[in-house]
Amino acid sequence: MAVGKEIRTQISSINNTRKITRAMEKVAASKTRKAQDRMAASRPYAERIRQVVGHLANANPEYKHRYLTEREAKRVGYIVISSDRGLCGGLNVNVFKKAIRDMKQFADTGVEIDICAIGSKAVSFFRNYGGNVTAAHTGLGDAPKADDLVGSVKVMLDAFDEGRIDRLYVVSNEFVNTMTQNPTVEQLLPLKAEENTELKHHWDYIYEPEAVEILDELLVRYIESQVYQSVVENIACEQAARMLAMKNATDNAGDIIDELQLVYNKARQAAITQEISEIVSGAAAV
């Protein structure tokens, strides 16, 4: 039964694939939990440094730092964060669509765009798409450190300091839960003023060195922390999306195996019926 042999080969092949996707699902689930822990651990630092920056800025209202001053947007920069690997559903495609939609609003008004791509998928996409990629970073792995991103972020901060870009945005995926990841665009520079009564409160701190010098340094650290937080959150999204994609692949493989098994059983039944008919016909002829 040649047909039956082919079907058994297909079933065996798909079953082997199902074993791989099931293993990848379990690995992704483990990495998702670790990524969530890193995300939760880094969030308090990002929030606290934002508060300190707010206190310093309100304590020195006469000092207008360039990162706090709005200016006409003639050229804008985007830090687009993606994964280094695939097999994570539409995670990267969704963030690219979000970035392009936001960029189009500026491009339609003649504003030029610079891109810092983080993650090999973003680098390859925007280089093929034709974007002006001024900085790129790949190979961050599953547990990146803030220092790994300093170089790429510095390229965009230097461009802002020198007036080559007038605004800076970060595009990444927001982790809602293991089933939901939303692509978002956040403005990094200039910093938007927040209506926060706690930040407006006068804090009687003693600064060493001067508050202005601390503010200069903290604003850079703040931008770096925000980008790092976005990268860590995007990694959690990547692992959650991969876990879901591998689960769907495993389930689909099971459905295909069931269908092929049914086809095999029908083919085997037909072959047996034919053999019986031939035996009966032969006996009748005798």
Swiss-Prot record:
Compartments where found: Cell inner membrane
GO molecular function annotations of the record: ATP binding; proton-transporting ATP synthase activity, rotational mechanism
Leader sequence residues: none
SUPFAM superfamilies from the UniProt entry: ATP synthase (F1-ATPase), gamma subunit (SSF52943)
Topology versus the membrane: Peripheral membrane protein
GO cellular component terms given for this protein: plasma membrane; proton-transporting ATP synthase complex
Biological process according to GO: proton motive force-driven plasma membrane ATP synthesis
One matching Pfam family: ATP-synt
Family: Belongs to the ATPase gamma chain family.
The protein's name in its UniProt record: ATP synthase gamma chain
Organism: Marinomonas sp. (strain MWYL1)
Gene it is expressed from: atpG
